[in-house]
């Protein structure tokens, strides 16, 4: 399955996230949903935050033109919030999954979808 298929089917296609991307551990975009553009600098900031989250804990982070307040940040997951919408990011051994949800979607529902796909990819060696 292609990275784009994971974005279109396993993330956005579930209805639990409205936009999604898969990034490499270097922050470069491998696949993205239409209209969701994560810049290389934003991807690199996110990727480095999995090793040292202090900068994003203090000031939040930006993805695709939206500034998020950091709710959770550890070596596996970074959760951000903007009003009643937010973003779930999860690191696997070779990639970073990004799922954005809007105010109509429960954060836990979005987190469940992104975390489960991450678990699957980790199990597959990715």
From Swiss-Prot:
One MF term in the entry's GO annotations: actin monomer binding
Region (Actin binding): 2-36
A single Gene Ontology CC term: actin cytoskeleton
Any Pfam family the entry gives: Profilin
PROSITE patterns, sorted: PROFILIN
InterPro entries recorded: PFN (IPR048278), PFN_euk (IPR005455), PFN_sf (IPR036140), Profilin_CS (IPR027310)
Site features described as Actin binding, chain residue numbers: 116
CDD domains: PROF
Physiological role: Binds to actin and affects the structure of the cytoskeleton. At high concentrations, profilin prevents the polymerization of actin, whereas it enhances it at low concentrations. By binding to PIP2, it inhibits the formation of IP3 and DG.
Keywords, sorted A to Z: Actin-binding, Cytoplasm, Cytoskeleton, Methylation
Self-association and partners: Occurs in many kinds of cells as a complex with monomeric actin in a 1:1 ratio.
Phylogenetic placement of the source organism: Eukaryota, Amoebozoa, Discosea, Longamoebia, Centramoebida
In-chain residues carrying the UniProt-annotated modification N6,N6,N6-trimethyllysine: 104
Keyword match Lipid biosynthesis: no
Subcellular localization(s) per the UniProt record: Cytoplasm, Cytoskeleton
Family: Belongs to the profilin family.
Example of a GO biological process term: actin cytoskeleton organization
Name of the protein this chain belongs to: Profilin-1A
């Amino acid at each position: 399955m292609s990275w784009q298929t994971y974005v279109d089917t396993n993330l956005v296609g579930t209805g639990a996230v409205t936009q999604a991307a898969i990034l490499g551990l270097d922050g470069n975009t491998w696949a993205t949903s239409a209209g969701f553009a994560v810049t290389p600098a934003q991807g690199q900031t996110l990727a480095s935050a999995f090793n040292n989250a202090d900068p994003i804990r203090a000031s939040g982070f930006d993805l695709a033109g939206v500034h998020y307040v950091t709710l959770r940040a550890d070596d596996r997951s970074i959760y951000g919030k903007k009003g009643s919408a937010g973003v779930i990011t999860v690191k696997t051994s070779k990639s970073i999954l990004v799922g954005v949800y809007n105010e109509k979607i429960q954060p836990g529902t979005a987190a469940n979808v992104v975390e489960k796909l991450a678990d699957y990819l980790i199990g597959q060696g990715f």
